[in-house]
């Protein structure tokens, strides 16, 4: 019986194995058939695309034969024929084409499948001549697709109605209809040019201390040098002036000062421009007096970014050592004046935090980082590594910083709060007994210095030493024998210490993790010199009649800044991150929207909480008071606009109504001058109009609103502004837009780190603009000050606030004798002057308060001599959005405010392992 059962099992097993093999064979056959079908489908698609391209070429030929100034009806008919044939230069036709392709593929697949089912035994695709021809056509599919795309681009991006009543632009295939105002007699006669106004960077608020180290220094000019975004700032705290080096194309990450204290090297990270082209990391060496670029080093050499760098000291700064952020953390040594790389070697796969040349031994370079300290012997083009041996001493998780004692010993601070002294000793060679080997560094002494990490070391001119602690936030002064003499603790609200530098006299400078720069002494404590936000920044509002601006960010801080003396008036921490803000027309209160649907009203003078409300549970994207201040509109990500009655000069609020009709979240909105209507944009490119007195009703006939002269213009979609959109935009490239109060220009914040200045109105596609670089992440907001004298822009991830001065270019003939130039005898001379507003900003009639005399903006100061002439090419802007080139070094003098290529929208701001650390992390971290 058992034998019978065993034989039965064997037979069942054999049968199941045979069944599995049959199924595998069937599946293999099916896969082969499907691959054959795909090949045929590719060939069919190639044929369709080729026919489409031929059709496009024919349409283009017909268009060339038609006069450009023909009747509007003929132009519209031609445009519609292009759309019918799939060749319009808009995205909608291409979307239709893609649907057609899917239908073609589907029918072809069914046909092929039926054929393959009937004639399975006769399938020999790969051997037939027809198959080879089809494969060749399929291989050329990508080329044909490219050709079709190019042919499509030849056609105009907009469609004008036959009657000239409206224009349609397309965004991601969706039509956006904009009605032409009545005062436009002929749309073809509209001309959009570059505005005469330009921008000049005047002030930068903020400092990058959260994820950087050793990036604050005092120069002989009395200026503090530091960086934020792609700007290196030189700040004279006594005279309250700033100068800016603008040569970088993305986030500046590290800085080194030459032994002569004049020349400076700064390194940046990699990025990508708006066209997807890489922005290579590099080091720029520049003159801190003239702000001219002396050399650009490392293009094509560094990966990801420049992590740290240092000038040599023993040879008076002839050489520069750089460590990049690649996996191997490559160490390179450069003769920077010759722009030549002398030596290169891999250091370690672990984090490297610091590199330094030995001040007296020109052949020694020291690097340190996670669980290591390396001593490099440099000879010619070779680098030899000797690892620091901790021996009986506990090996730290991180060696954080380096300094050098007068006797040549190396001093290192570690994550355990210990200072290690490494002395050069002689040891006995293991190869031959009795032989002595010089140059081995060993720990000769250790000193417990701080609770938590020793984050930074600063060797002072008098031989004393300053150390900065991470966790304990203490600055300690040590004498020549490394005995502690004095100490002081940085208050908790400023964060932990990131950088320590020697100041004037007995002063010292501190950079902190909460983006403060402090100046202090052991006797008098600290004074704040620089401060900024510590997280992503979106909210911005300018005061209606004072030189004040308000910002709010993810760090929950609300800050009121003075744009004249560039100081912080007050700051308040909310319960939630702020995202948008607007001042009441009286200027007495400001409304702030948050990420949770709650919004706060604060007293603009005392920062006291006046009111708090909640609308929905999603992010509020825009707050906008009506012109008379009687209504407040709140745009939300729940697709609604909430309306509130406002009384008592902005101190009392009651729900008025709700605008319902958008199919996506609200992005921007504006009021009409009579407070009757609202224009709004949404995330799916809608332009809707609302009748507020009639119960917040949606106006169905949008042409009724075409002649409204909106009190403000912040909507990014509309007839007066649609020309600002770049070609091929997906609808998210523009974050904010604002029209100046004098209605002359439009400022724009984009996703490619740029601030643009357009002429207003801007009703032609691909309008030209002045383009400015300073931010290193998406620019989130822009706003003009009340007299249009300045523009404020905010950066997202870079957390910076930029204040730009509007400059009006005025041309003069040579006979005016303003400036004599031997190089341009017959050319006009161009001078800069601050832009003066044509009309004062008037308060609404409902406002009873009148600004005091001392609240008015002081007269503009004279233009400095160095600003009196415009260069042959404006180096801090690019007037065409089409050009983008890699930065090039200059052997001679290169102006510092050049625009290199477009900076990246850098999510890579925190792209190194230490960047992701929080300021309250464990002491074992390199940033604790």
From Swiss-Prot:
WD repeats: 199-237, 241-288, 296-336, 343-378, 385-424, 442-480, 485-521, 524-563, 567-604, 610-646, 653-692, 702-760, 767-806
Key word Coiled coil present: yes
Region annotation (Disordered) ranges: 107-131, 821-928
CDD domains in alphabetical order: TD_EMAP4
GO annotation (BP), single: cell division
Composition-biased stretches (Basic and acidic residues): 116-131
GO cellular component: cytoplasm; microtubule; microtubule organizing center; midbody; mitotic spindle
Protein name: Echinoderm microtubule-associated protein-like 4
Intracellular or extracellular location(s): Cytoplasm, Cytoskeleton; Cytoplasm, Cytoskeleton, Spindle; Cytoplasm; Cytoplasm, Cytoskeleton, Microtubule organizing center
Bias (Acidic residues) ranges: 867-876
Role: Essential for the formation and stability of microtubules (MTs). Required for the organization of the mitotic spindle and for the proper attachment of kinetochores to MTs. Promotes the recruitment of NUDC to the mitotic spindle for mitotic progression.
Cleavable signal peptide: none
Membrane-spanning intervals of the chain: none
Ranges annotated as biased composition (Polar residues): 836-845, 877-898
Source organism, top-level taxon: Eukaryota
Keywords: Cell cycle, Cell division, Coiled coil, Cytoplasm, Cytoskeleton, Microtubule, Mitosis, Repeat, WD repeat
InterPro entries, per the entry: Beta-prop_EML-like_2nd, Beta-prop_EML_1st, HELP, Quinoprotein_ADH-like_sf, WD40/YVTN_repeat-like_dom_sf, WD40_rpt, WD_repeat_EMAP
Coiled-coil intervals: 14-63
Assembly behavior: Homotrimer; self-association is mediated by the N-terminal coiled coil.
PROSITE patterns: WD_REPEATS_1 (PS00678), WD_REPEATS_2 (PS50082), WD_REPEATS_REGION (PS50294)
Gene name, Swiss-Prot/TrEMBL: eml4
Chain residue ranges for the region called Microtubule-binding: 1-189
Pfam family, one: HELP
SUPFAM superfamilies membership: Quinoprotein alcohol dehydrogenase-like
């Amino acid at each position: 019986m058992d034998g019978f059962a065993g034989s039965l099992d064997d037979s069942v097993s054999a049968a199941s194995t045979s069944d599995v093999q049959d199924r595998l064979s069937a599946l293999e056959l099916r896969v082969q058939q499907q691959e054959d079908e795909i090949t045929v489908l590719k060939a069919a698609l190639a044929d369709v695309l080729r026919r489409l391209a031929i059709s496009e070429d024919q349409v283009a030929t017909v268009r060339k034969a038609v006069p450009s100034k023909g009747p509007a009806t003929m132009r519209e008919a031609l445009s519609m024929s292009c759309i019918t044939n799939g060749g319009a230069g808009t995205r909608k036709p291409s979307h239709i084409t893609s649907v057609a392709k899917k239908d073609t593929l589907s029918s072809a697949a069914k046909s092929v499948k039926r054929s393959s089912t009937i004639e399975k035994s006769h399938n020999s695709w790969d051997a037939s001549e027809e198959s080879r021809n089809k494969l060749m056509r399929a291989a050329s599919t990508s080329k044909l697709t490219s050709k079709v795309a190019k042919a499509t681009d030849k056609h105009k991006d907009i469609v004008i109605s036959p009657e000239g009543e409206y224009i349609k632009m397309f965004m991601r295939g969706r039509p956006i209809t904009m009605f032409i105002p009545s005062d436009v007699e002929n749309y073809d006669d509209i001309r959009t040019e570059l505005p005469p106004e330009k921008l000049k960077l005047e002030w930068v608020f903020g400092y990058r201390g959260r994820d950087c180290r050793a990036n604050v220094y005092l120069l002989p000019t009395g200026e503090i040098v530091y960086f934020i975004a792609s700007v290196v700032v030189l700040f004279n705290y006594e005279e309250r002036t700033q100068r800016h080096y603008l040569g970088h194309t993305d986030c500046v990450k590290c800085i080194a000062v030459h032994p002569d204290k004049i020349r400076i090297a700064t390194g940046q990270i990699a990025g990508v421009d708006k066209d997807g082209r890489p922005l290579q990391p590099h080091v720029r060496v520049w003159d801190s007096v003239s702000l001219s670029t002396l050399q650009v080093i490392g293009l094509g050499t560094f990966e990801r970014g420049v992590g740290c760098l240092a000038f040599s000291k023993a040879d008076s700064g002839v050489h520069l050592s750089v460590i990049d952020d690649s996996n191997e953390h490559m160490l390179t040594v450069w003769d920077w004046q010759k722009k030549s790389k002398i030596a290169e070697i891999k250091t370690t796969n672990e984090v490297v935090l610091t590199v330094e040349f030995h001040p007296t031994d020109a052949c020694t370079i020291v690097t340190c980082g996670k669980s290591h300290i390396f001593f490099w012997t440099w000879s010619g083009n070779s680098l030899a590594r000797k690892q620091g041996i901790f021996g009986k001493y506990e090996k730290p998780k991180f060696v954080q910083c380096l300094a050098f004692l007068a006797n040549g010993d190396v001093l290192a601070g570690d994550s355990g709060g210990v200072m290690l002294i490494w002395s050069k000793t002689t040891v006995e060679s293991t190869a031959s007994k009795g032989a002595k080997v010089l140059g081995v560094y060993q720990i000769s002494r250790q000193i417990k210095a701080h609770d938590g990490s020793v984050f930074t070391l600063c060797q002072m001119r008098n031989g004393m030493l300053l150390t900065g602690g991470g966790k304990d936030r203490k600055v300690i002064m040590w004498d020549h024998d490394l005995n502690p003499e004095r100490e002081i603790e940085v208050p908790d609200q400023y964060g932990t210490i990131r950088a320590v530098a020697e100041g004037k006299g007995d002063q010292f400078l501190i950079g902190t993790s909460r983006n403060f720069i402090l100046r202090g002494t052991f006797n008098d404590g600290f004074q704040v010199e620089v401060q900024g936000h510590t997280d992503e920044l979106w909210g911005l509002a300018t005061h209606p009649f004072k030189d004040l601006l308000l910002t709010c960010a993810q760090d929950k801080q609300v800050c009121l800044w003075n744009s004249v003396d560039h100081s912080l008036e007050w700051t308040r921490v909310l319960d939630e991150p702020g995202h948008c803000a607007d001042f009441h027309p009286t200027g007495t209160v400001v409304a702030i929207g948050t990420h949770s649907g709650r919004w706060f009203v604060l007293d603009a003078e005392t920062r006291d909480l006046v009111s708090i409300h909640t609308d929905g549970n999603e992010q509020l994207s825009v707050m906008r008071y009506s012109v008379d201040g009687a209504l407040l509109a709140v745009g939300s990500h729940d697709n609604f606009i909430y309306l509130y009655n406002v009384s008592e000069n902005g101190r009392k609020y009651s729900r008025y109504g709700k605008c319902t009709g958008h199919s996506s979240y609200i992005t921007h909105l504006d009021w009409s001058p009579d407070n009757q209507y609202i224009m709004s944009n949404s995330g799916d490119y809608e332009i809707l109009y609302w009748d507020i007195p009639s119960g917040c009703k949606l106006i169905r006939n949008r042409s009724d609103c075409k002649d409204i002269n909106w009190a403000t213009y912040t909507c990014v979609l509309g007839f007066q502004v649609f020309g600002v959109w770049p070609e091929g935009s997906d609808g998210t490239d523009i974050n904010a837009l604002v029209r100046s109060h004098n209605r002359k220009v439009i400022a724009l914040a984009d996703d490619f780190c740029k601030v643009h200045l357009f002429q207003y109105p801007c009703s032609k596609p691909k309008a030209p603009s002045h383009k400015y670089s300073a931010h290193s992440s998406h620019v989130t907001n822009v706003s003009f000050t009340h007299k249009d004298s300045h523009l404020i822009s905010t950066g997202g991830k870079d957390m910076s606030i930029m204040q730009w001065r509007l400059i009006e270019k005025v041309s003069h003939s040579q006979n005016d004798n303003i400036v004599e130039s031997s190089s341009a005898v017959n050319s006009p001379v161009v001078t800069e002057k601050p832009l003066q507003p044509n009309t004062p900003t008037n308060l609404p009639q409902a406002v009873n308060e009148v600004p005091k005399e001392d609240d008015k903006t002081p007269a503009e100061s004279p233009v400095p001599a160095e600003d009196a002439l415009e260069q042959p090419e404006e180096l801090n802007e690019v007037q065409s959005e089409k050009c983008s080139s890699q930065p090039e070094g200059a052997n001679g003098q290169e102006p510092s405010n050049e625009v290199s290529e477009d900076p990246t929208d850098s999510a890579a701001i925190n792209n190194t392992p230490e960047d992701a650390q929080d300021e309250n992390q464990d002491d074992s971290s390199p940033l604790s």
